[in-house]
Swiss-Prot record:
Lumenal compartment segments: 45-50, 107-110
Subunit composition and interactions: Component of the ER membrane protein complex (EMC).
Consequence the record notes for mutating T31A: No effect on EMC assembly but decreased membrane insertion of hydrophobic transmembrane helices-containing proteins by the EMC
Gene it is expressed from: EMC6
Protein known as: ER membrane protein complex subunit 6
Purpose of the protein: Part of the endoplasmic reticulum membrane protein complex (EMC) that enables the energy-independent insertion into endoplasmic reticulum membranes of newly synthesized membrane proteins. Preferentially accommodates proteins with transmembrane domains that are weakly hydrophobic or contain destabilizing features such as charged and aromatic residues. Involved in the cotranslational insertion of multi-pass membrane proteins in which stop-transfer membrane-anchor sequences become ER membrane spanning helices.
Family: Belongs to the EMC6 family.
Residue ranges crossing the lipid bilayer per the database entry: 29-44, 51-71, 90-106
Keywords assigned by UniProt, alphabetized: Acetylation, Endoplasmic reticulum, Membrane, Transmembrane, Transmembrane helix
Protein origin, superkingdom: Eukaryota
List of residues that carry N-acetylalanine: A2
Amino acid sequence: MAAVVAKREGPPFISEAAVRGNAAVLDYCRTSVSALSGATAGILGLTGLYGFIFYLLASVLLSLLLILKAGRRWNKYFKSRRPLFTGGLIGGLFTYVLFWTFLYGMVHVY
């Protein structure tokens, strides 16, 4: 008779260290893109609402690229898709505004 192997019911095993590492990579990507897009917005001279729309477009583009990179097996790397869209969004906004105002002042004011 063949041995019966019982399948484990419940959620798959997830390494907490790997989850933290992936979150750190997402945070690094979001911070880098925020700094780069803020510098770009400052050099282009975007002001007011146009500057914030530029940040929104850069964030959406980054999220789409992250989803494309994760592929169909995103659940192998993340618990949910939400961190790909919203992870580090507010912290990235602060970085964006910092670089945006600094480079706008350097290029267009001085």
